[in-house]
Amino acid sequence: MATTWPPRTVIRKSSGLRTLESALYRSGLGPVAGVDEVGRGACAGPLVVAACVLGPGKLESLAALDDSKKLTESVRERLFPVIRRYALAYHVVFIPPAEVDRRGVHVANIEGMRRAVAGLSLRPGYVLSDGFRVPGLAVPSLPVIGGDAVAACIAAASVLAKVSRDRLMVAMDAEHPGYGFADHKGYSTPAHSAALARLGPCPQHRHSFINVRRVANGSGGRVVADCKPDLPLQRDEGR
């Protein structure tokens, strides 16, 4: 009888972040890359996607790895340089708001995952994606629900994407004062909604989101003139 690989029981009953990756490495399917995104639900700023390949060994310096959303900012900042130092390869992709609007957030997310994996300096033997199937990859892949809490490579990618995006949003706050990007990181908070209503959208806002579109339509399409659509930090990075 045909079986699927990796066995679903490995995913459901994983006893640690390295269980699934270790099984893939033992089966000769490494290197294993994890891929994750941050900013999918934000109404401003880029969608940021990262891919990361960790070695098969366990590193004590990465013991704190988990879903980036569960970690404090200080822990994420501490892990960020450690991941970049010890990763066999990583690549971070920035999908600008205009492309998110043009493609739609889900399609942009999948495209970002493809770009992140393609940008790795080390070709993976297998790719684990957080939650979404990623068609069009050149290597076998598996979507893992809650993958950033199951696979260390996905958790590492999550941290890389989260810290990269948060730092960009802080820089964007200085470029576009008044919106509070450094605080809410582009997500729809009451403070952000109030600033959006007061100032109108800037080019970093996603018009495919109904709250932005409503404000833009209500203000006659007004866009803040001194908002700069491109920031130097919005470049893919990796090794």
Curated annotation (Swiss-Prot):
Ranges where the RNase H type-2 domain occurs: 30-221
Coiled-coil annotated spans: none
Residues where a divalent metal cation binds: D36, E37, D130
Organism placement in taxonomy: Bacteria, Bacillati, Actinomycetota, Actinomycetes, Mycobacteriales
Gene name as annotated: rnhB
Source organism (scientific name): Mycolicibacterium paratuberculosis (strain ATCC BAA-968 / K-10)
EC supergroup of this enzyme: hydrolase
Family: Belongs to the RNase HII family.
Localization of this protein: Cytoplasm
Protein known as: Ribonuclease HII
Cofactor dependence: Mn(2+); Mg(2+)
Keywords: Cytoplasm, Endonuclease, Hydrolase, Manganese, Metal-binding, Nuclease
Family annotation (PROSITE patterns): RNASE_H_2
GO biological process, one term: DNA replication, removal of RNA primer
